Amino acid sequence: MRKITYILIALVIFIFSGITLLLTTTGFKTNSFNSLINDKVNEVNPKLKLQLNDVNFKLGLKSFKFEVKTQNPKILINENEIDLESINFNINIFDYFNNKNPISRISIESKENSIDQLSNFINEYNFNLSRKLILKQIKKGNIKFNAEIFFDENEPNNLRYLLNGSVRETKVNLLNQLTFDNIKFDFLINKNFINLKNIDLIFDNIFITSDEISISKINREYEVTGNLKTKKTEININKYSAIINTNLDLLSDQSINLSSNNNLYFKINNKYKVEDFKIETKINFDELLTKSKFQDFIYLKNGDVFINYDKKKLDIALDSKFLFKNIKYNNSDSNNLFKAIYKKKKKFKCSSRY
């Protein structure tokens, strides 16, 4: 009898160990919890629906939670859908059987979706005319993202999220006036903050990069700060004077081979209009031609231009060498330094030393 008892105990231990090993390694597949998953998604928004395949469950021994993962699901609103790579979350077993919120966090990894597909989904999710008009400026592109959604145990409707990912091969046409091509960047987004990094784009055949642009939501406004850089490129600066609503009549209409480093700041108000635009720019140029009376016999070479612009002022400081067009007047031993300051609505002042 005792022998049979030992055998039964050993058999129970073996079966329990086998089940535990199965749950902690391979896990098992079921669709029994699909309704629970959809219920959690509905807490985000009742319009949202998930199209799920079988869900894989694995047991975490340390936390005593089921690690849940489903592959290739879709998230839908009416006819609009987003293709996902996976959805992952943990189910607290004790909370589940005590009728408490068993899921505190959901992790979502998307497949690559078109931005047009995502725009339609967002507009269906929460229609906003101003946002729709902005999204219509995006003509093409692809996006891939990861999302972390955190649920409050005591307030299920109070959730936090963190979104990160990348945008590639995007084209934006602002009001049919300014076109930006081959846009790519990485992003990090939460409720009140957007951070864009590793930005590359082409504007009017000018290659532009940025280490970082940050967008902060303050009340009903947005504050934007960032940095833009251009490599040495042939640029006609006067061509863009309309963008800053300033006539740069000091400069020649000829293109300039230059590079630039720009720090900018502006606000977007609750009507999506730009306010308080400010920019600080350093431009390095090879040769600079002006419309001044000196232009017929000298030109500026290997210099820097420092620009400080906001709606009240435009300050330009120039630090450069200058050369005579007639080379016999040039002295290779001299510095030929030229310094100038230009202020909007004030007189132009300059000084030189050679």
Set out the residue ranges of the language-model regions.
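Well-ordered beta-strand positions in beta-sheet-rich domains
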Residues: 81, 86, 184-186, 212, ...
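N-terminal Sec-pathway targeting helices
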Residues: 1-15
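Terminal hydrophobic membrane-targeting helix
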Residues: 18-120, 132-142, 146-156, 194, ...
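Extended amphipathic, helix-rich lipid-handling scaffolds
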Residues: 37, 41, 106-173, 185-194, ...
